[in-house]
């Protein structure tokens, strides 16, 4: 199994390297000596201490900042941490706008209606607003709003294949029966984003372990470490020997470790918190999008209304 897993990772890395090595003419600024500064706001539902969802955004921000600096574009960030899906988000968007941000990025699905309230104000019409994982820009009448996501289902399918390989190995070794090949999936909400992800994951697992079944438990929050742990615990107690997640924290991984189950992760490498349980994970690499969006605004261009890339473009990566 280790040889097959290594081959899968090598193929994914090869695709990512090809993506990173290909640039279009717009990747090079007209003047390599530009030293201008652009101010960008980033509104986060959590903070980097979650070691998951928001931490992944911070990692993308840092990589994009470094790449842009090499092009002569300096980014000054205004970051608002721990802003809920409520009027805290509204106020954070206003604060970023009043502090002179030319581009404001909101990192949670539930931030969208509060971001739109600010983006629609006439005094902010020249500021660009991005809703990560959102969808309204395609149908609203605002020219300064944009959606951004990635084809994370691609990474979930690969992670599902790895989970299925482990389950089939356990069956072949007599550790479990075919009927005991049960996956538990901790989901935040029953939204299309989550459903498409666990569907891809299940199909990946079933492609190599035909007897696999899956139980899904929703926790009603993107980021509730306690409820995520409780859901993972309940799934293990219900007979699940493999745990995965579409939620923000590391607690499903640590609970899988505690319960003696395996785990495939999201947003970050989970081997540090669950070394015996963690097999593989997948995450969105936000650096390519941040670099593209910031450079476009800096150069006076127009950001795509809807942006979504995948493994081949380096926007979805696997973690171990």
Residue ranges and their predicted role:
Residues 1-11:
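Positively charged n-region of N-terminal signal peptides that target proteins for export
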Residues 12-13, 138:
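Alpha-helical transmembrane segments and their juxtamembrane interfaces
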Residues 16-19:
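C-terminal motif of bacterial Sec signal peptides marking the signal peptidase cleavage site
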Residues 21-23:
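Bacterial signal peptide processing site
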Residues 30-320:
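A residue-level marker of the well-folded mature domains of exported/periplasmic proteins
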């Amino acid at each position: 199994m280790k040889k097959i897993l290594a081959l899968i990772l090598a193929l994914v890395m090869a695709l990512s390297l090809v993506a990173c090595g290909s640039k279009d003419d717009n990747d090079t600024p007209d003047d390599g000596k530009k030293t201008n500064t652009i101010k960008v706001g980033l509104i986060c539902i959590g903070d980097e201490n979650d070691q998951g969802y928001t931490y992944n955004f911070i990692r993308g921000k840092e990589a994009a900042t470094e790449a842009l600096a090499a092009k002569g574009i300096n980014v000054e960030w205004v970051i608002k941490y721990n802003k809920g899906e409520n009027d805290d988000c509204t106020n954070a968007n206003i604060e970023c706008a009043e502090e002179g941000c030319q581009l404001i990025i909101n990192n949670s699905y539930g931030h969208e209606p509060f971001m739109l309230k600010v983006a629609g104000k006439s005094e902010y019409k020249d500021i660009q607003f991005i809703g990560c994982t959102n969808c309204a820009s395609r149908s609203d009448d605002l020219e300064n709003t944009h959606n951004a996501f990635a084809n994370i289902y691609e990474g979930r399918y690969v992670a599902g294949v790895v989970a299925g390989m482990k389950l089939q190995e356990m069956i072949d070794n007599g550790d479990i029966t075919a009927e005991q090949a049960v996956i538990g999936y901790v989901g935040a909400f029953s939204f299309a984003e989550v459903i498409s992800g666990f569907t891809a994951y299940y199909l990946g697992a079933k492609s190599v372990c035909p007897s696999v079944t899956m139980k899904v438990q929703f926790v009603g929050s993107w980021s509730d470490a306690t409820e995520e742990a409780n859901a993972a615990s309940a799934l293990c107690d219900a007979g699940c020997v493999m745990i995965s997640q579409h939620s923000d924290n590391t607690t499903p991984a640590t609970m899988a470790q505690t319960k003696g189950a395996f785990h495939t992760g999201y947003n970050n490498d989970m081997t540090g918190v669950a070394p015996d349980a963690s097999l593989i994970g997948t995450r969105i690499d936000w650096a390519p999008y941040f670099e593209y969006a910031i450079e476009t605004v800096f150069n006076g261009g127009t950001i795509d209304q809807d942006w979504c890339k995948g493994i081949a473009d380096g926007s979805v990566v696997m973690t171990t």
